[in-house]
Regions:
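Long, internal low-complexity/basic segments
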Residues: 75-92, 97-99, 107-182
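C-terminal cap/loop subdomain of S1 sulfatases and analogous C-terminal strand-loop tails that border
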Residues: 1-93, 171
């Protein structure tokens, strides 16, 4: 209300975001944090292709708003490289939003930015702790990933829209809920 009433407001120094998935086939947990200038993205399943990238671009495109292979190939190297990174993201990505607002150049290996990386990693871990983000626990991440993989294989093999004939178990191990405690 202070801003509304003409007062001053203390603005945030960081903004955090999370993506886990909209449905089992696009499960791909990511967390990000940005400061005024830099953005860090953590890709928890960098050992596999990003299913959203598969669905929105490339030869197996499932959804219209994405880019076709021909459209991607017609782009310059920076755009093609961005699509390649979208499909096969590294464990972490770091962008200088002042110099590179479109996030083309991943600076994660730039040693001159070690202090920036340390700060963003620390603030992201703090936020994950404050919000009780269970994905930060490797055991929980593995269990949730196995559950998504099982459901995707059994219910979504022939269609991205799949079946709804399954039950999730994640509430039990993420939040300690069970049938009796609903």
């Amino acid at each position: 209300m202070a801003l509304w009433e003409g007062g001053t407001v203390a603005w945030r120094d960081y903004v955090c975001a999370e993506w886990t998935g909209a449905n089992p086939p696009v499960y791909f947990p990511q967390r990000s944090i940005r400061s005024e200038r830099y953005k860090l993205i953590v890709n928890y399943l960098s050992d596999r292709p990003n299913p959203s990238a598969i669905g929105y671009s490339g030869p197996n495109q499932l959804w219209e708003p994405g880019a076709t292979v021909e459209e991607i190939l017609a782009c310059d190297d920076r755009v093609r490289n961005a699509y390649a990174r979208y499909l096969d993201p590294p464990p972490e990505e770091l962008f200088d939003l002042e110099k590179d607002p479109w996030e083309y150049d991943n600076l994660i290996d730039d040693v001159t930015l070690n202090d920036v990386k340390t700060d963003l990693r620390s603030k992201l871990a703090e936020w994950q702790s404050e919000t009780d983000d269970r994905i930060a626990d490797p055991e929980i991440l593995n269990r949730l990933t196995q559950e998504h993989d099982t459901i995707s294989a059994s219910q979504y093999g022939e269609s991205a829209w799949g079946s709804r004939d399954f039950e999730w178990n994640y509430a039990d191990y993420l939040f300690g809920h069970n049938e009796a405690g609903k």
